[in-house]
């Protein structure tokens, strides 16, 4: 049975899963979810994701939600497909896991808030909360200072090769690079180079094309 991703093309979480599938050379069907009408908060969608968020994922009889859990499933179950997104070395895997936690717990809260305020709200006709932007930018800057130090030690956050750690960052960075927050990334040379590297990955470019069809 075909892999299905139920989600919205504008959703960073949907983008994250799509990019992972394309990195692994896996075909999938994108099943659009109309979030404007609230489809994600109603049945039958709630049978796929009881929290009413996107995406939801189906691989045969298996149903998953939470984008980072989905990408980890894909990377492990389809380890022999496409690009290797996880580190097999038992001494390197914990380092990758640490930085995956950092992305989810330290980067995501501030980056996603900025994406919402500066990237999504203008598209859907909502007013940006300038105070929220200012506070989130300050907090994101602190995280990126740590990233700048980390990237002096290795080419990517999880180690010397591109992994899920880096992939998980891409959707928010993609949105923020077209906003005034771009300067927060560009002012840190190693962070700026890392962003350019991961945004140029063919799988990400292909994923955007698929989502925007």
UniProtKB/Swiss-Prot annotation:
Domain GST N-terminal per the UniProt entry, residue ranges: 1-82
GO terms (BP aspect): glutathione metabolic process; toxin catabolic process
EC numbers for this chain: 2.5.1.18
Description of what induces expression: By aluminum stress and phosphate starvation.
Keyword Transferase attributed: yes
Origin superkingdom: Eukaryota
Binding site for glutathione: 11-13, 40-41, 53-54, 66-67
Pfam families in the record: GST_C (PF00043), GST_N (PF02798)
PROSITE patterns: GST_CTER (PS50405), GST_NTER (PS50404)
One GO location term (cellular component): cytoplasm
GO molecular function: glutathione binding; glutathione transferase activity
Record-annotated disulphide pairs: none
Domain GST C-terminal: 89-213
Catalytic activity: RX + glutathione = an S-substituted glutathione + a halide anion + H(+)
Database matches in CDD domains: GST_C_Phi, GST_N_Phi
Entry keyword set: Stress response, Transferase
Protein family according to the UniProt entry: Belongs to the GST superfamily. Phi family.
Known function: Conjugation of reduced glutathione to a wide number of exogenous and endogenous hydrophobic electrophiles.
Designated name of the protein: Glutathione S-transferase APIC
Native organism: Nicotiana tabacum (Common tobacco)
Gene: APIC
């Amino acid at each position: 049975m075909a892999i299905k991703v139920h989600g919205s093309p504008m959703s960073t979480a949907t983008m994250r899963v799509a990019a992972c599938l394309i990195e692994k050379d896996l075909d999938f069907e994108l099943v659009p979810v109309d979030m404007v009408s609230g489809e994600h908060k109603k049945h039958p969608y709630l049978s796929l994701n009881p929290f009413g968020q996107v995406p939801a994922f189906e691989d045969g009889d298996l149903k998953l939600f939470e984008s980072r859990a989905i990408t980890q499933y894909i990377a492990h179950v389809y380890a022999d497909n496409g690009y290797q997104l996880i580190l097999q070395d038992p001494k390197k895997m914990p380092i990758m896991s640490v930085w995956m936690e950092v992305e989810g717990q330290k980067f995501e809260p501030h980056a996603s808030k900025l994406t919402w305020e500066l990237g999504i709200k203008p598209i859907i006709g909502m007013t940006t909360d300038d105070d929220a932007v200012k506070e989130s930018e300050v907090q994101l800057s602190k995280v990126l200072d740590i990233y700048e130090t980390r990237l002096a030690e290795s080419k990517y956050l999880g180690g010397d090769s591109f992994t899920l750690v880096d992939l998980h960052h891409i959707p928010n960075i993609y949105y923020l690079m077209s906003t005034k927050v771009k300067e927060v990334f560009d002012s840190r040379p190693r962070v700026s180079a890392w962003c350019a590297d991961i945004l140029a990955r063919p799988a990400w470019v292909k994923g955007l094309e698929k989502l925007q069809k």
